[in-house]
Curated annotation (Swiss-Prot):
Taxonomic path: Eukaryota, Viridiplantae, Streptophyta, Embryophyta, Tracheophyta
Main subcellular location of this protein, as a coarse class: membrane
GO molecular function, one term: phospholipid:diacylglycerol acyltransferase activity
Substrates-to-products reaction catalysed: a glycerophospholipid + a 1,2-diacyl-sn-glycerol = a monoacylglycerophospholipid + a triacyl-sn-glycerol
Organism name: Arabidopsis thaliana (Mouse-ear cress)
Active site: 237 (acyl-ester intermediate), 567 (charge relay system), 620 (charge relay system)
Protein name: Putative phospholipid:diacylglycerol acyltransferase 2
Length: 665
């Protein structure tokens, strides 16, 4: 039986192979062609991946085996060079970050923040902004009444050196300085980052987190465990006024709300305070942030692409949400200009008077958005404003208000205006959003902006009028004036301690105070505003905006923003005045006559891609990668005095500007 079956199977196979049917043949060939097409697509992808991998490995091989020309090699780091020269770690070092650069992580949150426990909401990839923007805004905002945590939310500062080494991936803040300190012998036992929640008022960092007490204990511990060597403190930006607050707090008795260290605590524990980019007297950009959630970059973007950030676009109300969040941060109020018209100028005069605009057309490329704006110059109608600039007018409403003599300006008293009437803007038509602007009558808004200009003194009245709740809360923690009599008991209150014009440096004649900052970059000094108009169905909750269509004959007026010399964020007058004059020698602000030193770093853009953001940059954050500044900090930490590193080094007109400022010393 089985031989018969094998014979039949063999016969059928032979028939099919010898006499194949045409129809069957056709059906067999078509799938083969389709399979061939699919395989060729996969093969192409595989070949492409192979080419890329081969090229990558070839480049790696060349990188490791072929000598790199000297001109393409990264320069030797200051830490390596100083270590070779015998410079070694000596004084313990405390780093104090400023606003924004410190990381914040979530410890408790709403259901929308599920999965984010102990993950960074600030100071990382910022991917959560795109994934859940409203949830992100809610968790970074503080309570509008207390300035502390909202109920059910706990966001805290990231501890340790990682708190502010990088602001975002590949964007260093303190990392380069930390690495260079390590090269001369620093490590965890003698190097510390004093992180704190930079959103809070300085007093509230102690109330909620005991940040000041922790800093005091850390300084005492590092002093005791490092051979009783005094500590070198290196604050940056707002960290400078935060540490100024600490200097007063630590010696104030415990019953008066201080740290109880006693009058000699600073003299015993601190060798020097090396302030980097200090915002001692505030920054004008804090005004524009609180007034309209804007700065020069946003104004430029609006002039290039009108409507991009307006409420009409996708109904996002981006700036409205950012303004509501920033209005809950008391720390921003600490950065408002201090000293009033005596420091920043009045309607007709200012400290920079008589100084020509130092930036030529050619140098305007330093402002990236400004350069972009120039490329579209012929496409945009631009109004021209003639110099001389009136920098004392921190905010001017309209071109005429920025030019007219003060006698021709409106004499409006903001304090006499009513905020609310029957036509108040109590709702918007683009989703639920509320700000303090919603309580203002349209009549009041128009009067505020009608042919008026505001100085550093009157702009505070303007902010009190448009955001009374925010200013009442924040001004319980900060003051922005000049003390008449520093011995007046009222200056024992903590709200004066972060203002160098309303507090004294400690009695520590051997201490040194440094002001290190960049110069040669256009820095925001004053603004020209206009009333915002809404052409679409959405009605903006922010009635004012910088007039981005206004340009001057030089780069000192660009996009409605006037620029002066500085480090791109802090004008020279704010960073340098106290070391140049306010604390120079024995003054009422520096009763023990501790030495002060000015060290300026002239900005030089990066010369190659290998320099990243520049080894000679003077920009506000990038300066912490400046080789000259790093060398100065390392030498001070290793025991050098201000005279031994070269004393003052000045490129700007800070001394001349300081001479023009007349205050009681």
């Amino acid at each position: 039986m089985s031989p018969l079956l094998r014979f039949r199977k063999l016969s059928s196979f032979s028939e099919d192979t010898i006499n194949p049917k045409p129809k069957q043949s056709a059906t067999v060939e078509k799938p083969k062609r389709r399979r061939s097409g699919r395989c060729s697509c996969v093969d192409s992808c595989c070949w492409l991946i192979g080419y890329l991998c081969t090229a990558w490995w070839l480049l790696l091989f060349l990188y490791h085996s072929v000598p790199v020309p000297a001109m393409l090699q990264a320069p030797e780091s200051p830490g390596t060079r100083l270590s070779r020269d015998g410079v070694k770690a000596f004084h313990p070092v405390i780093l104090v970050p400023g606003i924004v650069t410190g990381g914040l992580e979530l410890w408790e949150g709403r259901p929308c923040a599920e999965g984010l426990f102990r993950k960074r909401l600030w100071g990382a990839s910022f991917s959560e902004i795109l994934r859940r923007p409203l949830c992100w805004l809610e968790h970074l905002s503080l309570d509008s009444e207390t300035g502390l945590d909202p109920s059910g939310i706990r966001v805290r500062a990231v501890p340790g050196l990682v708190a502010a080494d990088y602001f975002a991936p590949c964007y260093f803040a303190w990392a380069v300085l930390i690495e260079n300190l390590a090269k001369i012998g620093y490590e965890g036992k003698n190097l510390h980052m004093a992180s704190y929640d930079w959103r809070l008022s300085f007093h509230n960092t102690e109330v909620r987190d005991q940040s000041l007490s922790r800093l005091k204990s850390k300084i005492e511990l590092m002093y005791a465990t490092n051979g009783f060597k005094k500590v070198v403190v290196v604050p940056h930006s707002m960290g400078a006024i935060y540490f100024l607050h600490f200097l007063k707090w630590v010696e104030t008795p415990l019953p008066d709300g201080g740290g109880g260290g006693g009058p000699g605590w600073c003299a015993k524990h601190i060798k020097s305070v090396v302030n980097i980019g200090p915002a001692f007297l505030g920054v004008p950009k804090a005004v524009s942030n609180l007034l309209s959630a804007e700065g020069k970059d946003i104004a430029y973007a609006r002039s290039l692409a009108p409507g991009l950030l307006d409420s009409e676009l996708l109904k996002l109300q981006t700036l409205e949400h950012l303004m509501r969040m920033s209005h809950s941060w008391d720390s921003i109020v600490s950065l408002l200009p201090k000293g009033g018209e005596a420091i920043w100028g009045d309607l007709d005069s200012h400290a920079e008077e008589g100084l020509n605009c130092i930036y030529s057309k050619r140098k305007s490329s330093q402002l990236s958005l400004s350069n972009l704006h120039k490329q579209n110059y012929s496409l945009k109608p631009v109004s021209r404003v003639k110099e001389p600039a009136k920098y004392g007018r921190i905010v001017s409403f309209g071109k005429r208000a920025s030019e007219l003599p003060s006698s021709q300006l409106s004499t409006l008293n903001v304090k006499e205006l009513s905020r609310v009437d029957g036509n108040s803007n109590d709702s918007t038509s683009c989703g639920e959003f509320w700000s303090e602007y919603n309580e203002m009558s349209r009549e009041s808004i128009v009067k505020v902006a009608e042919n008026t200009a505001y100085t550093a003194t009157t702009v505070l009245d303007l902010l009190r009028f448009i955001a009374p709740k925010m200013m009442r809360r924040a001004e319980a923690h900060f003051s922005h004036g000049i003390a008449d009599d520093l011995d007046d008991p009222k200056y024992g209150h903590y709200k004066y301690w972060s203002n160098p014009l309303e507090t004294k440096l400690p009695e520590a004649p051997e201490m040194e105070m440094y002001c290190l900052y960049g110069v040669g970059i256009p820095t925001e000094r004053s603004y020209i505003y206009k009333l915002a108009t809404s052409s679409g169905k959405c009605k903006s909750s922010i009635p004012f905006r910088i007039d981005g269509s206004l340009d001057g004959d030089d780069v000192c007026l660009k996009g409605g923003t006037r620029f002066a010399d500085g480090d791109e964020s802090v004008p020279v007058i704010s960073a340098g005045f106290m070391c140049a004059k306010g604390w120079r020698g024995k003054t009422r602000f520096n009763p023990s006559g501790m030495d002060t030193f000015l060290r300026e770093y002239k900005h030089k853009p990066p010369g190659s891609l290998l320099e990243s953001r520049g080894t000679e940059s003077g920009a506000h954050v990038d300066i912490m990668g400046n080789v000259g500044l790093i060398e100065d900090v390392l030498r001070i930490a290793a025991g050098a005095s201000g005279q031994e590193i070269g004393g003052d080094r000045i490129y700007s007109d800070v001394m001349r500007m300081s001479e023009r400022i007349s205050i009681k010393l």
